[in-house]
Amino acid sequence: MLFRTVLWLASLAFMHTTSPAMEAKVVNDTLILSGPVVQGDIQRFNEAMAANPGIGTVVLRNSLGGHVESGYRIGELIRKHGLSTVVSGHCVSSCSRMFLGGKERRFSNDYSLERTFVGFHGHYHANGQLNRALVERLGLLKWIIKYSDGKADPDLVQRWINIELNTGMVAFMHPQTRIFFRDEKTFFCVGREQLRPLGCSTLAVTALDMGVVTDLALSRSPDQ
């Protein structure tokens, strides 16, 4: 129901977790990663790949991000290994860079489509305010354009990496997502909206336009 969906999305702004690392499990040829991104996840990712050389797909599930460097490095490792990525539920911040690492990138229908999105923003201080110096030093703009296979619009990326609050983001949903009174499925959130992302303003670009995904086929994770 729409009411339940809205409540769930609103709760994202208030979620906290004490999980020590991303939860990882391997099902067939798929590595499923969920939860917060923390320091040490790069090593754990490498260990999972070494122990399971047949992995071809990484599913990223319900992660609000976390450790900055891990998002970059794991995304780069995913691309280096030629793996595909799939978003299952929400994948925001550092998780979104891991997702962009996929050679092929898709949405899943593990959850309802209005609960499934990839969310991008900048880098932030501990108080939630934008850390412009870190955004510039790590080259976030160029990195996103590179890993979107050159498709991301630099002007829009520049806008989202300069969102002032870490509760803001640009959230990309699948074009087939059914949302009452909304034709566009990309949302620009400044971070002060009560209902994010569905209560945010919309943008007339799609995840496919921007190279967030490589096609619109919907995947299903092997544990669902």
Language-model region placement:
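Bacterial N-terminal signal peptides
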Residues: R4-H16
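Glycine-rich beta-to-alpha active-site loop
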Residues: R79-H125
